[in-house]
């Protein structure tokens, strides 16, 4: 048995998911959807750097779904709920399950209650499962923390830090992080909403709070530019000394006046250029205290690609509804033929 997978969006992450899916014994990549005229109509296998497969890159998702008959569509196009809601409904009308790496979809119930109700209704109307996931939100600063609290008798508060490298990501992430801007442009971008830093603090904090039964009634965020002292260059970004290399973003979740969850997430391209070591650090204060250090960081690009691939069977095998990671079977790497979870 092989699940049929259609990928919508062939940016850095979407292409990675498509390539990974094509290498899995229990998954079959049946096509992709793109808006870039230079990609449309090309052979998908050849575009991904392999041999011709006869599977094409479509411009029209309706035609793609009708012709390829996927079990699931992986949407890798946008970060925000409002941007993917219509796309999700378009796929759902074909009674096809959906997995998206849109960060706000990891746990939209707190930040977008009205849209979440709409999505829940769509899921039940068409009998489909909908899940948002990725490395973060979706794993490091939420699901992994939730799993670790399972070894605690009680939990008083949580602190976690993810110090990571943005280099593997594409232009959309660079833009939302302010990479390549001047300090003045960064400040203006924060004010206009063009620069948002990390997308997902509200989702991660709300997911943790929901899992632990904490009534998180307020989430506060702060953002500061990371000014580069060195020249840095990736395939999609070029930063000179004095320009912004990333964003130091902090999210805090409160129950009343009590700080329960603090997540710290400085993200920048090529942090090693200035001697910064990446890593993931989780501190759970309770009984007992638990402290986890992962060095270097779990790579953001590979981690997102892996989770978007590895969660496919769980989404297909789940019942209808708008799902979130903590209510599904724990992620595991797909190595061989898929067995029912």
Model regions and ranges:
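Alpha-helical support elements that line or immediately flank enzyme active sites
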Residues: 139-150
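N-terminal glycine-/serine-/threonine-rich beta1-alpha1-beta2 phosphate-ribose binding loop
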Residues: 1-94
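Gly/Ser/Thr-rich loops at beta-strand to alpha-helix junctions
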Residues: 11-13, 80-81, 105-109, 135-141
């Amino acid at each position: 048995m092989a699940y049929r997978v259609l990928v919508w969006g062939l940016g850095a992450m979407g292409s990675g998911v498509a390539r990974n899916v094509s290498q899995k014994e229990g998954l079959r990549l049946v096509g992709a959807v793109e808006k870039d005229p230079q990609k449309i109509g090309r052979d998908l296998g050849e575009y991904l750097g392999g041999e011709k497969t006869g599977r094409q890159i479509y411009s029209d998702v309706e035609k793609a779904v009708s012709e390829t008959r996927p079990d699931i569509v992986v949407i890798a196009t946008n970060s925000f709920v409002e941007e993917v809601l219509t796309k999700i409904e378009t796929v759902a009308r074909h009674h096809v399950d959906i997995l998206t790496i849109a960060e706000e979809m990891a746990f939209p119930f707190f930040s977008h209650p009205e849209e979440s109700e709409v999505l829940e209704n769509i899921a039940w109307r068409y009998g489909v499962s909908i899940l948002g996931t990725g490395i973060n939100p979706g794993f490091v600063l939420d699901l992994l923390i939730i799993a670790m609290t399972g070894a605690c008798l009680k939990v008083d508060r949580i602190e976690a830090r993810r110090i990571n490298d943005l280099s593997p990501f594409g232009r959309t992430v660079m833009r939302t992080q302010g990479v390549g801007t001047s300090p003045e442009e960064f400040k203006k971008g924060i004010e206009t909403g063009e620069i948002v830093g990390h997308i997902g603090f509200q989702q991660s904090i709300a997911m943790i709070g929901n899992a632990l039964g904490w009534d998180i009634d307020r989430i506060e965020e702060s953002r500061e530019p990371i000014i580069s002292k060195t020249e840095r260059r990736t395939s999609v970004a070029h930063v000179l000394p004095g320009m912004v290399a990333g964003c130091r973003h902090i999210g805090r979740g409160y129950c009343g006046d009590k700080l329960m969850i603090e997540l710290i997430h400085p993200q920048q391209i090529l942090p090693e250029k200035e001697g910064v070591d990446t890593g993931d650090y989780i501190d759970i204060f309770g009984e007992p205290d638990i402290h986890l250090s992962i060095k270097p960081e779990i790579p953001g690009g590979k981690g997102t690609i892996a989770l978007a691939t590895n969660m496919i069977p769980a989404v297909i095998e789940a019942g209808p509804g708008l799902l979130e990671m903590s209510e599904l079977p724990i992620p595991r790497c797909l190595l061989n033929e898929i067995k029912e979870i």
